[in-house]
C-alpha cells in the first residue's frame, strides 16, 4: 500500500497538535512552544492556538477532520482577522477514510460588473490602489460556500461547529503583542477605507491584554448558523454587503452573491518514491508546481547530496526556477484559459526541462543582487487536521492581502477581500 501525502500550495501539511505548535523559532502569540507535539486520536495545526483548540474540542466531541477544519476556519475568522475570514476564499484538499481524494475550490470570483479596464485611468495607466484597497478591490466571497460544501463529509451539525466562533466574537478574546501591533499598524487604512469606524479601530492604541469583542460579526455568524449558506449569500447579510458596496462604488451585487458556488474538482495526484502525493488543482498552482518539482528531482540521488549542502540547495533552486517560469507562462484559471497540465506534468517534458542543469554551475554572481528578507506573511493562513478515523484535511484560506481590502461590512462586522488584485 502506498503511503499518503497531502499537499496544498507549496506547504506540506504537518499534522501536529494544538497550542504548542507555532514555530520552533518564531512565537508571535507569546505562548509556550515545543519543537514536537504528539497525539493518538487526531491533531490540529493552525496559525492561532485558540483556533487550534476549537478544532481539537470538536474532535473530542466525536467530530471528524472535516468538522474540525470547519470549526477551526470559523474561529480563525474571529481571532485572526488579518487572514482568517468569512469575506475571502480558499482551497481545501483532503483524503477520506474511505480512500476518496477531494479538493474544493472556494476562491473569490469577479463580480459580474467587472471589466477588463476597470482599474485603468483615462490615459490607460493602472490605478493600483483601486485593485488593492477599498470596495472595488473585492471579489465575491467564497469561504462560507466552501465550508458548507465540505460539511457533507462531516459528522456533526453545522450549528455545533460555528458556535465556538460565535462565542469568541461575542465574548471576545485577549490580544497578544503581535496582534496589537498588527491592528495599530492598520489603523490609518481602516479609517481611510470605511465610512464608519470598524471594531478594529480604537481611539487609543491597542495594547497587549486588551479584549477584542466583535458583536456585529457574532450576529452574522448567528445568521449563518440559523439559515445556513443562505444566511450569508441571501437575506440580511447579503443586503449589508451590497449596501457597503454602494457606499464605496464596489461591484458585488445580490445576484453575484446568490449565484456563487464552491466547486469540487479532481485533485492532482502523483507518485513519488513510494508515496502518493495529493495536491490542489487549478486555479491553485500549488499541486502542479509540486508535481513538477518533485518529479524533476525524483531520479536524482538527492540523499547523497546531503541536507542543505551547496549541491542540494543549488539543485532545488534550479528546479524551482524552472517550475515557476512555467507557472508564469502557462498556469491560470481553467474556467477561462487552457492549461496544458498533461504536458507540464509529463516525465518527458520535465526531463527536457532539466537537460540544461549543470551541477556546480550557478547563475553568474554579477547578475545576482541581495534580496529583501521579509518576515512570515500575515496575509494567508493554513490549517491541517487529522482524525482517528483516517481522514486528513488541509486548507488554505485568505483575504489576499493582510486585512484584505481594509473594508469592513458595516453592520456585519467582517472584512472583505482584495482578491481582484491577485
PLM feature segments, named:
Residues 114, 402-417, 421:
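A short, polar/charged loop-to-alpha-helix boundary motif
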Residues 152-158, 226-229, 297-304, 327-331:
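Short helix-capping/linker segments at secondary-structure and domain boundaries
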Residues 292:
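Protein kinase glycine-rich loop
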Residues 1-26:
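Bacterial Sec-dependent N-terminal signal peptides
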Amino acid at each position: 500500500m502506498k503511503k499518503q501525502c497531502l499537499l496544498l500550495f507549496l506547504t506540506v501539511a504537518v499534522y501536529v497538535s494544538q497550542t504548542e505548535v507555532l514555530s520552533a523559532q518564531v512565537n508571535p502569540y507569546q505562548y509556550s512552544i515545543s519543537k514536537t507535539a504528539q497525539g493518538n486520536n487526531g491533531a490540529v495545526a493552525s496559525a492561532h492556538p485558540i483556533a487550534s483548540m476549537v478544532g481539537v474540542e470538536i474532535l473530542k466531541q466525536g467530530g471528524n477532520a472535516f468538522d474540525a477544519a470547519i470549526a477551526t476556519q470559523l474561529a480563525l475568522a474571529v481571532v485572526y482577522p488579518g487572514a482568517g475570514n468569512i469575506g475571502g476564499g480558499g482551497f481545501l484538499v483532503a483524503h477520506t477514510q474511505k480512500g476518496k481524494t477531494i479538493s474544493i475550490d472556494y476562491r473569490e470570483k469577479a463580480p459580474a460588473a467587472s471589466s477588463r479596464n476597470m482599474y485603468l485611468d483615462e490615459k490607460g495607466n493602472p490605478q493600483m490602489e483601486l485593485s488593492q484597497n477599498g470596495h472595488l478591490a473585492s471579489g465575491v466571497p467564497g469561504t462560507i460556500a466552501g465550508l458548507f460544501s465540505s460539511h457533507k463529509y462531516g459528522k456533526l451539525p453545522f450549528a455545533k461547529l460555528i458556535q465556538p466562533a460565535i462565542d469568541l466574537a461575542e465574548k471576545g478574546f485577549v490580544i497578544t503583542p503581535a496582534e496589537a501591533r498588527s491592528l495599530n499598524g492598520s489603523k490609518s487604512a481602516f479609517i481611510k477605507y470605511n465610512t464608519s469606524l470598524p471594531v478594529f479601530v480604537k481611539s487609543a492604541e491597542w495594547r497587549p491584554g486588551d479584549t477584542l469583542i466583535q458583536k456585529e460579526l457574532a450576529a452574522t455568524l448567528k445568521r449563518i448558523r440559523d439559515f445556513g449558506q443562505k444566511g450569508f449569500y441571501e437575506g440580511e447579510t447579503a443586503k449589508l454587503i451590497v449596501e457597503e458596496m454602494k457606499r464605496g462604488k464596489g461591484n458585488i451585487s445580490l445576484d453575484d452573491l446568490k449565484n456563487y458556488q464552491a466547486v469540487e474538482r479532481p485533485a492532482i495526484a502523483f507518485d513519488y518514491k513510494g508515496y502518493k502525493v495529493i495536491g490542489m488543482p487549478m486555479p491553485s498552482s500549488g499541486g502542479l508546481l509540486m508535481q513538477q518539482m518533485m518529479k524533476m528531482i525524483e531520479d536524482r540521488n538527492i540523499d547523497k547530496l546531503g541536507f542543505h549542502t551547496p549541491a542540494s540547495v543549488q539543485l532545488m533552486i534550479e528546479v524551482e526556477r524552472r517550475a515557476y517560469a512555467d507557472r508564469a507562462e502557462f498556469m491560470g484559471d481553467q474556467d477561462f484559459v487552457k492549461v496544458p497540465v498533461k504536458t507540464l506534468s509529463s516525465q518527458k517534458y520535465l526531463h527536457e526541462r532539466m537537460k540544461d542543469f549543470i551541477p556546480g554551475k550557478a547563475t553568474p554572481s554579477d547578475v545576482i543582487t541581495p534580496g529583501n528578507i521579509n518576515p512570515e506573511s500575515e496575509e494567508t493562513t493554513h490549517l491541517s487536521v487529522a482524525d482517528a478515523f483516517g481522514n486528513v484535511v488541509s486548507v488554505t484560506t485568505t483575504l489576499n492581502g493582510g486585512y484584505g481590502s481594509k473594508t469592513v461590512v458595516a453592520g456585519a462586522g467582517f472584512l472583505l477581500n482584495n482578491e481582484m488584485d491577485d
